[in-house]
Protein backbone atom coordinates (compact mmCIF):
# COMPACT_ATOMS: atom_id res chain seq x y z
CA UNK A 1 0.00 0.00 0.00
CA UNK A 2 0.91 3.62 0.40
CA UNK A 3 4.52 4.09 1.50
CA UNK A 4 5.61 0.79 0.01
CA UNK A 5 7.92 0.39 -2.97
CA UNK A 6 7.40 -2.29 -5.61
CA UNK A 7 10.53 -3.48 -7.40
CA UNK A 8 9.83 -4.97 -10.81
CA UNK A 9 12.20 -6.59 -13.25
CA UNK A 10 11.34 -7.46 -16.80
CA UNK A 11 11.32 -11.17 -15.96
CA UNK A 12 7.65 -11.72 -15.21
CA UNK A 13 4.44 -11.55 -17.17
CA UNK A 14 1.88 -8.84 -16.46
CA UNK A 15 4.43 -6.11 -15.69
CA UNK A 16 1.97 -3.50 -17.00
CA UNK A 17 -0.77 -4.74 -14.68
CA UNK A 18 1.60 -4.81 -11.71
CA UNK A 19 2.68 -1.21 -12.40
CA UNK A 20 -0.90 0.02 -12.75
CA UNK A 21 -2.06 -1.82 -9.64
CA UNK A 22 0.89 -0.57 -7.58
CA UNK A 23 0.17 3.00 -8.61
CA UNK A 24 -3.54 2.54 -7.83
CA UNK A 25 -2.54 1.45 -4.32
CA UNK A 26 -0.29 4.49 -3.85
CA UNK A 27 2.96 2.56 -4.04
CA UNK A 28 6.19 3.83 -5.53
CA UNK A 29 7.57 1.79 -8.42
CA UNK A 30 11.20 0.89 -9.00
CA UNK A 31 11.92 -0.78 -12.32
CA UNK A 32 14.99 -2.73 -13.35
CA UNK A 33 14.61 -3.04 -17.12
CA UNK A 34 16.42 -6.34 -17.39
CA UNK A 35 16.23 -8.11 -19.74
CA UNK A 36 15.57 -5.49 -22.43
CA UNK A 37 12.78 -6.64 -24.74
CA UNK A 38 10.73 -5.03 -27.48
CA UNK A 39 7.58 -5.34 -25.32
CA UNK A 40 9.16 -3.28 -22.56
CA UNK A 41 8.43 0.00 -24.37
CA UNK A 42 4.71 -0.84 -24.28
CA UNK A 43 4.65 -0.82 -20.46
CA UNK A 44 3.25 2.25 -18.68
CA UNK A 45 6.78 3.44 -17.90
CA UNK A 46 5.50 6.92 -17.03
CA UNK A 47 4.35 5.33 -13.74
CA UNK A 48 7.92 4.42 -12.72
CA UNK A 49 9.48 6.43 -9.88
CA UNK A 50 12.97 4.89 -10.04
CA UNK A 51 14.70 3.32 -13.01
CA UNK A 52 17.60 1.15 -11.81
CA UNK A 53 19.38 0.22 -15.02
CA UNK A 54 22.76 -0.44 -16.56
CA UNK A 55 24.20 1.48 -19.50
CA UNK A 56 22.93 -0.97 -22.15
CA UNK A 57 19.39 -0.78 -20.77
CA UNK A 58 19.77 2.98 -20.39
CA UNK A 59 20.70 3.45 -24.05
CA UNK A 60 17.77 1.31 -25.18
CA UNK A 61 15.24 3.12 -22.98
CA UNK A 62 16.60 6.56 -23.84
CA UNK A 63 16.68 5.74 -27.53
CA UNK A 64 20.26 6.95 -27.89
CA UNK A 65 23.17 5.20 -29.57
CA UNK A 66 25.75 7.24 -27.68
CA UNK A 67 27.81 5.57 -24.99
CA UNK A 68 28.31 8.93 -23.27
CA UNK A 69 26.71 8.77 -19.86
CA UNK A 70 25.50 12.38 -20.03
CA UNK A 71 23.61 11.68 -23.26
CA UNK A 72 22.05 8.56 -21.78
CA UNK A 73 20.95 10.43 -18.65
CA UNK A 74 19.62 13.36 -20.69
CA UNK A 75 17.67 11.01 -22.95
CA UNK A 76 16.18 9.18 -19.99
CA UNK A 77 15.29 12.45 -18.23
CA UNK A 78 13.52 13.65 -21.39
CA UNK A 79 11.61 10.38 -21.76
CA UNK A 80 10.76 10.00 -18.08
CA UNK A 81 10.77 13.47 -16.48
CA UNK A 82 9.03 12.30 -13.29
CA UNK A 83 11.43 9.44 -12.55
CA UNK A 84 14.77 9.26 -10.79
CA UNK A 85 17.43 7.55 -12.90
CA UNK A 86 19.95 5.22 -11.27
CA UNK A 87 22.45 4.25 -13.97
CA UNK A 88 25.00 1.60 -13.03
CA UNK A 89 28.14 1.94 -15.11
CA UNK A 90 30.27 -1.06 -14.17
CA UNK A 91 33.74 -0.20 -12.92
CA UNK A 92 32.88 3.51 -13.02
CA UNK A 93 30.21 3.03 -10.35
CA UNK A 94 26.75 4.56 -10.40
CA UNK A 95 25.20 7.81 -11.63
CA UNK A 96 21.99 9.29 -10.23
CA UNK A 97 19.83 11.94 -11.83
CA UNK A 98 16.55 13.37 -10.60
CA UNK A 99 15.02 16.74 -11.53
CA UNK A 100 18.37 18.37 -12.21
CA UNK A 101 20.14 16.83 -9.20
CA UNK A 102 23.13 14.73 -10.23
CA UNK A 103 25.14 12.46 -7.99
CA UNK A 104 27.70 9.76 -8.59
CA UNK A 105 29.48 7.16 -6.54
CA UNK A 106 32.48 5.05 -7.43
CA UNK A 107 32.98 1.38 -6.77
CA UNK A 108 34.86 -0.20 -3.88
CA UNK A 109 37.93 -2.15 -4.89
CA UNK A 110 37.56 -5.78 -3.87
CA UNK A 111 38.80 -9.06 -5.25
CA UNK A 112 35.88 -10.13 -7.42
CA UNK A 113 34.96 -13.78 -6.94
CA UNK A 114 31.40 -14.03 -8.28
CA UNK A 115 29.30 -11.20 -9.74
CA UNK A 116 26.05 -13.21 -9.79
CA UNK A 117 24.25 -11.18 -7.10
CA UNK A 118 25.84 -7.77 -7.71
CA UNK A 119 22.87 -6.12 -9.40
CA UNK A 120 20.22 -7.64 -7.16
CA UNK A 121 22.20 -6.68 -4.07
CA UNK A 122 22.58 -3.11 -5.33
CA UNK A 123 18.82 -2.87 -6.00
CA UNK A 124 17.93 -4.29 -2.60
CA UNK A 125 20.20 -1.95 -0.69
CA UNK A 126 19.11 1.03 -2.80
CA UNK A 127 15.48 0.35 -1.91
CA UNK A 128 16.33 -0.36 1.73
CA UNK A 129 18.00 3.05 1.89
CA UNK A 130 14.91 4.69 0.43
CA UNK A 131 12.62 3.02 2.96
CA UNK A 132 14.96 4.11 5.78
CA UNK A 133 14.71 7.70 4.53
CA UNK A 134 18.47 8.03 4.07
CA UNK A 135 19.98 10.86 2.00
CA UNK A 136 20.60 9.79 -1.60
CA UNK A 137 24.38 10.16 -1.19
CA UNK A 138 24.27 7.55 1.61
CA UNK A 139 21.92 5.28 -0.33
CA UNK A 140 24.33 5.16 -3.27
CA UNK A 141 27.27 4.58 -0.91
CA UNK A 142 25.64 1.70 0.98
CA UNK A 143 24.24 0.06 -2.15
CA UNK A 144 27.71 0.24 -3.73
CA UNK A 145 29.34 -1.18 -0.60
CA UNK A 146 26.83 -4.02 -0.40
CA UNK A 147 27.38 -4.86 -4.05
CA UNK A 148 31.17 -4.86 -3.55
CA UNK A 149 30.86 -7.24 -0.62
CA UNK A 150 28.57 -9.51 -2.65
CA UNK A 151 31.01 -9.83 -5.58
CA UNK A 152 33.83 -10.69 -3.16
CA UNK A 153 31.96 -13.86 -2.17
CA UNK A 154 30.87 -17.02 -3.92
CA UNK A 155 27.21 -17.65 -4.62
CA UNK A 156 24.03 -15.70 -5.14
CA UNK A 157 21.81 -15.23 -2.07
CA UNK A 158 24.60 -16.47 0.21
CA UNK A 159 26.85 -13.61 -0.95
CA UNK A 160 24.46 -10.83 0.06
CA UNK A 161 25.79 -9.04 3.15
CA UNK A 162 23.85 -8.05 6.24
CA UNK A 163 23.21 -4.38 7.00
CA UNK A 164 25.78 -4.62 9.85
CA UNK A 165 28.46 -5.87 7.46
CA UNK A 166 27.75 -3.01 5.07
CA UNK A 167 27.87 -0.20 7.62
CA UNK A 168 31.15 -1.54 9.03
CA UNK A 169 32.67 -2.26 5.60
CA UNK A 170 35.11 0.67 5.45
CA UNK A 171 36.37 0.30 9.01
Where are these regions (language model features)?
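Ribokinase/PfkB-type carbohydrate-kinase core domain
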Residues: 1-103
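Conserved phosphate-binding/catalytic region of the ribokinase-like
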Residues: 38, 69-171
Amino acid sequence: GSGDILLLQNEISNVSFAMEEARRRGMQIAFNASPITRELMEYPLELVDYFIINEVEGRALAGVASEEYDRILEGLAEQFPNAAIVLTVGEKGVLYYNHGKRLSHGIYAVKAVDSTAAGDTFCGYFLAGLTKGLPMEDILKYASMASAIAVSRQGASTSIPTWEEVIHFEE
